[in-house]
């Protein structure tokens, strides 16, 4: 008996510029390029187009340009969830979406400063900043006003999200150059290479 893998329509973590709004349209476009044996997600981001490509075309070689280190963020979901638990304790009793008082902000910063491993500041900042604002570092986060937007639930494990996908990291122009002369290659956003 084969196990059905999850079909992704959105990335497992927040990402500015996520392409989830046209996931179904992208699936339809992929059907038009059945002759393409290699699909390159040049602009990477959350890897959603690469994931959809592999789900729709399991026979194809799919390459994801992880320029934004999304794979590291996915691998660290358990750590992010652990930090979110700590943040929930700090903001307990505060009204949702309200301004976080200075002493609570300092407690949150103290928690983050004590972290010695990888911290997904994009996911953490999405729980602390005004809607659709993100920071990528502790220094950037410290400068912001905090709001109690802390997630009420953990992020779901993203097991298998990048399975079967070749992860590379580089300038999209360099990756384009690497594949432009190969036959049957489809670049992200259906730009035929």
Task: Identify what each model region corresponds to.
Residues 1-38, 48, 55-56, 123, ...:
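S-adenosyl-L-methionine
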Residues 21, 37, 44, 48, ...:
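Short, well-structured alpha-helical interface segments that form or flank functional binding sites
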Residues 27, 40-53, 64-68, 127, ...:
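Conserved proline-anchored active-site loop of SAM-dependent methyltransferases
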Residues 28-32, 52-53, 155-158, 175-178:
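Short, flexible, glycine/charge-rich loop motifs used to bind or transfer phosphoryl groups or to couple energy/partner
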Residues 35-37, 59, 182-184:
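A general structural motif
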Residues 49-55, 73-77, 179:
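A short acidic (Asp/Glu
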Residues 61-166:
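Class I S-adenosyl-L-methionine-dependent methyltransferase module
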Residues 163-193:
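Conserved mid-sequence domains
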């Amino acid at each position: 008996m084969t196990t059905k893998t999850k079909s992704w329509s959105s990335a497992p973590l927040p990402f500015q510029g996520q392409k989830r709004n046209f996931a179904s349209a992208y699936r339809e476009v992929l059907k038009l390029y059945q002759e393409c044996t290699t699909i390159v997600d040049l602009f990477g981001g959350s890897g959603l187009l690469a994931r959809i490509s592999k789900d729709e075309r399991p026979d194809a070689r799919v390459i994801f340009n992880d320029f934004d280190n999304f794979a590291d963020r996915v691998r660290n979901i358990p750590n992010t969830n652990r930090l979110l638990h700590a943040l929930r304790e700090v903001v307990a009793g505060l009204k949702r979406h309200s301004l976080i008082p200075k002493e609570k902000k300092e407690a949150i910063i103290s928690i983050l400063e004590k972290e010695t491993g990888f911290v997904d500041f994009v996911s953490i900042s999405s729980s602390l900043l005004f809607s659709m604002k993100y920071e990528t570092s502790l220094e950037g986060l410290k400068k912001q006003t905090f709001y109690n937007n802390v997630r009420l639930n953990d992020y779901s494990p993203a097991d298998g999200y990048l399975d079967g996908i070749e992860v590379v990291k580089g300038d999209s122009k360099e990756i384009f150059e690497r594949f432009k002369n190969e036959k049957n290659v489809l670049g992200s956003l259906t730009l035929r290479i």
